[in-house]
Amino acid sequence: MLVGVTTPEKFYFDEVHYVPAARQMLEPVMPNPVLNPMHPPLAKQLIALSIRSFGDGPLGWRYPGVLFGALSIVAVYLCGLALFAKPGPAVAASLIAFFNQMLFVQSRIAMLDIFALAFGLFGIAAFMHGFRQARPHLAFALAGLAFGLAAACKWSGLFALAVCIVIVAAIRLMQGWRTQFADGRDGDWYRPGLWPDFRYYHFAACFVLLPAVVYLATFVPLHGLSASGLVEAQRRIFSDNTTTAIAGHTYMSAWPSWPLLVRPVWYLFDKIGDDRIAAVVLLGNPVVLWAALPALAICLRDWIVTRRADAFLVLAFYFGPYLAWALLPRTLGFLYYYLPAATFASLALVYVLRRGNSPRWLLWAFVAVACAGFAAMLPISAAFVGTSMETFVRLMLFQSWI
């Protein structure tokens, strides 16, 4: 993912917001006004650290995104290992997540989303490993730590934490009501004896206190230990994300359209020759993301009919972070908000492709097809590749993609 990451050598898309904010953090004394106060500081601090290490240029701006993109792939592997208990399907899920194109593109631009994604996926992996354990305390604490770091990059990192809170609260309520399935099985998503020693104070420590402490700690370098400064920073983030009027955008889209890839985001479109352009379009690989939709329907059927825990977890961590956008008052949306759900969709595909008596080759055949789709999209995924206008137009299959 690092190859050609320094192209273009200028800012593109939202780098114009985040790199100057990261530069400001390197000043001996933080000047006023603070740039980009609408997001928490951690991702910008990581970009600032990279600028200090590699210089104030394209490599310094974008290297941490590449690193966290690679870590996201590792985190998908850990999620797959938790779900399928075998390395083969976990590797397949990681490859499909990479080939979905969104993760690759988002890793090569100095934006905040890839950092929140990586921390969030590590949190989900820890939660899913703990989900099947009698004593999930350590795994759940690690999940809370990771979710605190995700939220410290972007508040959308809280969505996966909210999913975990809802899952644990629902299971505890059902246990309190002494709910039982008449034909209960070990593979059920709910069991009366799940987590016998996990108390309410453990829940509060893992999913409230620990994430909050980790999150607030990232503000200390900017605001010190001033309670008023920390509170004002949170008020500003909330205000800017919920009440500030934001004009429309050429590539904005509504959340119901994201799974269908109706409206991509053109990050870059530069003419570099007589018939050569450098383009970066966040679109998603249709081979992967359209195929994921029937796969999710099969997961839903299996959860309802057979109560499978793996199907339940896939559905929870796909739909939770995705549908959370439907509840927010913010009207300006972009396809890259779908990145966490799109990445997690790879696990739904692996679940379905190895389900029942499916031949082993079927999963790897799909990985190969996904790879072919990714390769075909490379001219619009990486600016250093370049392409002709004819090829670009051919890749824009629908009018809404232009």
Predicted regions and their residues:
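Transmembrane helical bundles and short interhelical boundary loops of multi-pass, membrane-embedded
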Residues: 166, 172-176, 180-207, 211, ...
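Loop-to-helix entry region of an early transmembrane alpha helix in multi-pass inner-membrane enzymes
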Residues: 40-45, 54-74, 91-94, 106-110, ...
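Short helix- or helix-capping micro-motifs
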Residues: 93-98, 105, 125, 147, ...
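Short acidic/glycine- and proline-prone juxtamembrane loop motifs at membrane-interface regions
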Residues: 12, 65, 102-115, 155-156
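Transmembrane-helix signature of polytopic, membrane-embedded enzymes
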Residues: 76-99, 131-142, 312
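Membrane-interface transmembrane helices that cradle and orient dolichyl/undecaprenyl
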Residues: 84, 123-140, 150, 169-179, ...
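Transmembrane-helix motifs of polytopic, lipid-linked glycan transferases
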Residues: 63-84, 122, 126, 294-299
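Hydrophobic, aromatic-rich transmembrane alpha-helices
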Residues: 271-307
